[in-house]
């Protein structure tokens, strides 16, 4: 069962050349990227005593906004995306900046099922896929025993519709119009149900909010709009 939403792919295909333009279609991701990286690295270093040989998988990597900086810091990163044009953009940027990383054009379904990783990352992806439950199950099956995963997405709440779609897309123009579909947003409780009997435990939920007074993004306990989900797999 494929997780590919062809309409979503077509949408991102048109702007796949623009990933590293901080003033372009993905400008908002550049704004939140330092916080995303800081959160991911904090979770990795808190969970593992020795990070020198860790293998990281970034699913739906886009142009490599997370994968390339992680690899630049010495992590062993494999990053996959369904769009070949995204992989070409990511590969070119990494090469230009002397970063060693393994970029692959692949869906999570096409990835070898017996290959496990210490860390699995999937940021701002699950709200763009079909068959989301199967996608998430395929995602977590690649986590090693005692491994971790970090997912980020948007909550399906009224506030998320107002801020994530009306304000972000139509008023402020932070992202292109029609980037998001409210019906595809997921509540944490829904992901929790999908993970039942998988041996995966949700250890933390952390919100990401925009502080208008300070004109900055920051982590928060408010998960009404954007949120991170930190997962751990048991040792069995």
UniProtKB/Swiss-Prot annotation:
Pfam families the record matches: Methyltransf_23
Pathway(s): Cofactor biosynthesis; ubiquinone biosynthesis
GO biological process assignments: methylation
Keyword S-adenosyl-L-methionine applies: yes
E.C. number: 2.1.1.222, 2.1.1.64
Keyword Transcription appears in the UniProt entry: no
Disulfide pattern: none
Sorted UniProt keywords: Methyltransferase, S-adenosyl-L-methionine, Transferase, Ubiquinone biosynthesis
Catalyzed reactions per annotation: a 3-demethylubiquinol + S-adenosyl-L-methionine = a ubiquinol + S-adenosyl-L-homocysteine + H(+); a 3-(all-trans-polyprenyl)benzene-1,2-diol + S-adenosyl-L-methionine = a 2-methoxy-6-(all-trans-polyprenyl)phenol + S-adenosyl-L-homocysteine + H(+)
Residues noted as binding S-adenosyl-L-methionine in the record, renumbered to the chain: 36, 60, 81, 123
CDD domains assigned: AdoMet_MTases (cd02440)
Gene Ontology MF terms: 2-polyprenyl-6-hydroxyphenol methylase activity; 3-demethylubiquinol 3-O-methyltransferase activity; polyprenyldihydroxybenzoate methyltransferase activity
Free-text function comment from the UniProt entry: O-methyltransferase that catalyzes the 2 O-methylation steps in the ubiquinone biosynthetic pathway.
Family statement: Belongs to the methyltransferase superfamily. UbiG/COQ3 family.
Protein name, per record: Ubiquinone biosynthesis O-methyltransferase
Organism (species): Rickettsia canadensis (strain McKiel)
Designated gene of the protein: ubiG
């Amino acid at each position: 069962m494929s997780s590919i939403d062809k309409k979503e792919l077509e949408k991102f295909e048109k702007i796949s050349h623009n990933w590293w333009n901080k003033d372009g279609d993905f400008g908002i991701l550049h704004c939140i990227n330092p916080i995303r990286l800081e959160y991911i690295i904090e979770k990795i270093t808190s969970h593992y005593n020795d990070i020198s040989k860790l293998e990281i998988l970034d699913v739906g990597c886009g142009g490599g906004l997370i994968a390339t900086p992680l690899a630049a810091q010495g992590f062993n990163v494999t990053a996959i995306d369904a769009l070949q044009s995204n992989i070409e953009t990511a590969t070119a940027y990494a090469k230009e900046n002397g970063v060693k990383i393994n970029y692959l054009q692949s869906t999570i379904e096409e990835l070898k099922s017996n290959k496990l990783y210490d860390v699995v990352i999937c940021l701002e992806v699950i709200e763009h896929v079909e068959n989301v439950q199967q996608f998430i199950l395929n995602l977590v099956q690649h986590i090693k025993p005692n491994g971790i995963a970090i997912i980020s997405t948007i909550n399906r709440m009224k506030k998320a519709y107002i801020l994530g779609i009306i304000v972000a897309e139509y008023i402020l123009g932070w992202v292109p119009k029609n980037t998001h579909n409210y019906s595809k947003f997921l509540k944490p409780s829904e992901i929790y149900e999908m993970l039942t009997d998988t041996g995966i435990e949700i250890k933390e939920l952390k919100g990401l909010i925009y502080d208008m007074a300070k004109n900055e993004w920051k982590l928060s306990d408010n998960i009404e709009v954007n949120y991170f989900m930190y997962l751990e797999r048991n040792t069995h």
